[in-house]
Structure formats: structure tokens, C-alpha cells
């Protein structure tokens, strides 16, 4: 939900994975912190009041890489044989299967897959940004 900045998905084992929020003091730490965890859980309970009775099994934090226009970079680079797929933000968890397939095509053919042409690394220099800031439903 963009209003409460959280998401809920169910794992193959039936467990709920709850996430969202951003540390108000960004760093490269990957441990998570209690204030962020509390904010996300409060948001989830606002959406699903019955979740207030759930037990938290574990929590973690991590780094989310986000390109300046909030769109992924899937591209060959000026360095021969060096390709990049990065900047996916939180959308990468859902979209990376297609991202992997299109990157494999780019590597195999040394040309971008037609679906990812707009997401080239040189779009920043050329001023052809792909503004996807609202695509994840949350403000990064």
C-alpha cells in the first residue's frame, strides 16, 4: 500500500513475508532496526487488524539499490564484455526473472533485448530517463 508503505506476500511454506519502509537514517548497514520494524508492522496492522496477533519469527534488513529515475539499468557498458543489471529498487524481487532473461539476451547478442532498450545505462547522459517512481507503490 502506498499510503502505509508496506507489502505482504506468502512464501511457498505458507509463511507471510512482510516488508516495506526505509530507514530514516540510511546507511550501508544490513541489520535492520527496531523503529523501522515497528513502523512497518504498525502499517500492516492498519491494513489487516487481525495481524496484530501474529508472532514475528525473524526480521532482517538489506540494501535496496535504486537508480536515479527509479527504473532498472539493464545494459551493456562502454567496457567490452561488461554488462549491468542493477537499480531495480524493490521491484527487482518481482521482476528479476524477466530481467535475467533480457540480460541473457543482451549478453548473447551484444545488443539489448527490445523490451529493455529504454533501460540502457546511457539514458542518463542522453536525458532519456524512464520515471518509474510510483511503480512500486511506495516512495523510495
Report each predicted region and the residues it spans.
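Active-site substrate-recognition segment that forms the wall
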Residues: 1-80, 138-140
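C-terminal lid/capping helical subdomain adjacent to the catalytic/cofactor pocket in oxidative enzymes
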Residues: 78-140
Amino acid at each position: 500500500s502506498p499510503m502505509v508503505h508496506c507489502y505482504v506476500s506468502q512464501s511457498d511454506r505458507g509463511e507471510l513475508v512482510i516488508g516495506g519502509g526505509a530507514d530514516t537514517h540510511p546507511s550501508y548497514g544490513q541489520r535492520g532496526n527496531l523503529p523501522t520494524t515497528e513502523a512497518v508492522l504498525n502499517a500492516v496492522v492498519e491494513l489487516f487488524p487481525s495481524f496484530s496477533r501474529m508472532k514475528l519469527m525473524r526480521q532482517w534488513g538489506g540494501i535496496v539499490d535504486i537508480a536515479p529515475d527509479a527504473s532498472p539499468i539493464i545494459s551493456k557498458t562502454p567496457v567490452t564484455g561488461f554488462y549491468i543489471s542493477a537499480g531495480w529498487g524493490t521491484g527487482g524481487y518481482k521482476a528479476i526473472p524477466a530481467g535475467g532473461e533480457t540480460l541473457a539476451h543482451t549478453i548473447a547478442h551484444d545488443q539489448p533485448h527490445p523490451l529493455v532498450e529504454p533501460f540502457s545505462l546511457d539514458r542518463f547522459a542522453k536525458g532519456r530517463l524512464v520515471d518509474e517512481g510510483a511503480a512500486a507503490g511506495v516512495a523510495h
